Amino acid sequence: PGAWTVSSILALGLGTLVVLHIALVQRDFSRQLAADLPKNAPTAFLLDVQPDQWSGVAALLAAEGATRVDSVPVVTARLTAIDGTDTATLAARAKGDPRRQRWALTREQRLTYLATLPPDNRVVEGALWSDPSAAEVSLEKEFAERIGARVGSLLDFDVQGVPLRLRVTSLRTVDWRTFGINFFLVVEPGVLEKAPQLRLAAARLPKEREGRVQ
């Protein structure tokens, strides 16, 4: 019984230390995250806004004192082939290649279309919207590496039943630390406007108003 009591006390003490350590790590992480966030970082994100709802949502955000509102269209699609090779074959090959990631090939993709890139994006290879003979897409650089694409690659998509071929004309780096709205795939204007789509929005709200909008 004495030994059991000692063991119980030790276990309780160790458990308390572990919980305390986790709490301290969480607190330090939260402080670091808060310190790293830009002062104008969004504090609220609105997902799956219907296009015909957006004007009302924008008015609500303005009424709640939003000082920054960003909104972009979102089109879902499936990547079906890269340079003529179907993604099922590419995913099978990716099993033995540490540079490739199968999820990037097989998951549902979310595309947006923009005339200009957000300020936290930087083109590092190729040029944005530089090929008038093709429908163009700009890829985030690490995503391009994961799927095995490069400048000049042809990407085939199934956009909710409609086939679409896009040429990669630029690669970008993205500063994800800004918490801005960013995408792996950005398509040039004039290609996806008629596709079924939703809107994604990010806003910076006064702290006391965040709960009301969410």
Where would I find each of the regions flagged by the language model?
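Alpha-helical transmembrane segments of bacterial inner-membrane membrane proteins
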Residues: P1-Q214
